[in-house]
Amino acid sequence: MIDQIINYNKTFVSQKGYEKYITDKYPDKKLAVLSCMDTRLTELLPAALGLKNGDAKIIKNAGGLVISAFDSAMRSLIVAIYELGVTEIMVVAHSHCGACHMNYDHFHQEMIARGITDETLNTIRKCGVDLDSWLEGFKDTHTSVRKTVDTIKTHPLVPKDVVVRGFIIDSEKIGRAHV
């Protein structure tokens, strides 16, 4: 699959398909969107929010969560604020999210089946990583959005004038965003 993508890219570049996407690194709307990496949102999310290329920084991860005050999602938001001029942040979760109800036992079985040994997992634990928590999903989408919004709003490095709001989008039917 990667070879097919690279071959497509060669054609894309040679035909200058990139020209209509040229913009600078600063988001025109001074907006960052933290959302889930779900493939249903790839085109739906920007379309449902009326965003075009260059309007916003879109940060994606499993569940659209900030799971720690100093995780990579939070780091990206801090960079967006201080380096890219972001003044508003939308946390956008979605219905029927795969990260909801994730559990370590499932991941453990899949890892073992794919050749990761218990010895490796135990070594990671001995290094202080709580794999159970790290791979745990959330039980309620509304609660996860509120928690993420609160983590961002109360972060010691986020200025008080940055607007942070949370939404849930219907990823299967209408693309409607609601609080």
For each feature predicted by the language model, list its residue ranges.
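Gly/Ser/Thr-rich loops at beta-strand to alpha-helix junctions
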Residues: 37-40, 95-99
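Conserved beta-strand-loop surface patch within small alpha/beta domains used
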Residues: 15, 19-74
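Short secondary-structure capping micro-motifs at structural edges
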Residues: 74-81
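Short beta-strand segments
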Residues: 34-36, 60, 92-94, 167-170
